[in-house]
Amino acid sequence: MKKELCVILILSTLFFVQAAENSSYKVMVLGDIHYDNAEFHQKEAPSKALKKERIRNYEMWKGPSVRLLESAGKRAKSESCVFAIQMGDIAQGDADTPELLGKMLEKAFRTVKSHFPDIPLLAVKGNHDIRGYRKTIQRPADNVLMGLVAKELGAGKGSSWTFRKGKDLYIGIDGFRPEKQCIAFVKKALQDNPDTRYVFLVTHLPLIPATVHSPFWNLPGNFEIADLLEKRKTVVLAGHTHSFSIVSRKSRNGKLIQLVSTSLGRDWLSGKPMQPSLDWTSVREAAQKTVRGKNAEKTRRILETLDSKGEYSARIYTRISGYVILNIGEERVEAAIYTGEGKPVLMEILAENR
């Protein structure tokens, strides 16, 4: 077990460019995708909820999910994106055996990669990527999915990774490890890279609460990690919630902005306008409602810590899918959110270099 964890936590580092290269570039960001196919499910779904998810996924991958990826691939090429990042839940999971889960993850990754043949495709683990039949299975995601990511990075395999793009540091975190390991990984990455322009934390689970459905299902060690990151010019990129959102935390030490993305095919070209539907008050009220039962005291302490860490704001948007292009330059990091073939529906500054 110790040997396995040692391998999992290898720090994978790659310098894609020399420091002298142009400091402006663009990155494609994809949210949850949930690739699925009947060939991985020979057994009946173990619950009605999972049966509905399978039906949803099969319908998505008959057309909408493919068209979303086609659009993203064309956009990445026309905008000269230098790499693409997928925010976890690249696959549905729930495969009948560990071997089938590994095959599902490989096919999911290669399906997405086929739309970005000329640039590296990176990913982090999502909760569905480690979902076996009725139980959690880490090994296929560690060996297969993260093995494919390691090849894209050109570095050693690990379920968490880092790389430098010029003056910018990217930290891809495995949010399904113990809290101490998550904190230690981020801390070491920052210590090893003191000279950054921007830091990008790539995580499936949000760092800052971004949903009213499970407001405390966040990255392990999220408070400590946020304290470390707010001292840098940091952008947090997350998935998991199936809704676009922009959440910020401001304290005396700095400001963090988190962008959550979603790329579920069922919400692609849905015809809905992209508009805010919930704010931080909604998230806070949902969190307060969880203070009950046998874990009430523990939850209350978490909520008190959340409140003490700074001032928050949030815009959680209506359910609509798409993708994001990050325009990273010397003055700022700006996100362009696309939910169709036309112009971006939202432009948002995520960090400023001043």
Model-identified regions with their sequence ranges:
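Short acidic, glycine-rich surface-loop motifs adjacent to enzyme active sites
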Residues: 195-212
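Bacterial N-terminal signal peptides
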Residues: 6-14
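C-terminal/domain-terminus segments
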Residues: 86, 94-106, 333-354
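Short, solvent-exposed loop/turn elements at domain surfaces
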Residues: 25, 35-42, 179-182, 210, ...
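N-terminal active-site segment of His-dependent metallophosphoesterases
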Residues: 19-99
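Extended active-site neighborhood of metal-dependent phosphoesterases/phosphodiesterases
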Residues: 40, 49-50, 55, 95-198, ...
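Active-site glycine-centered loops adjacent to acidic/histidine catalytic or metal-binding residues
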Residues: 32, 88-89, 126-127, 204, ...
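Positively charged n-region of N-terminal signal peptides that target proteins for export
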Residues: 1-4
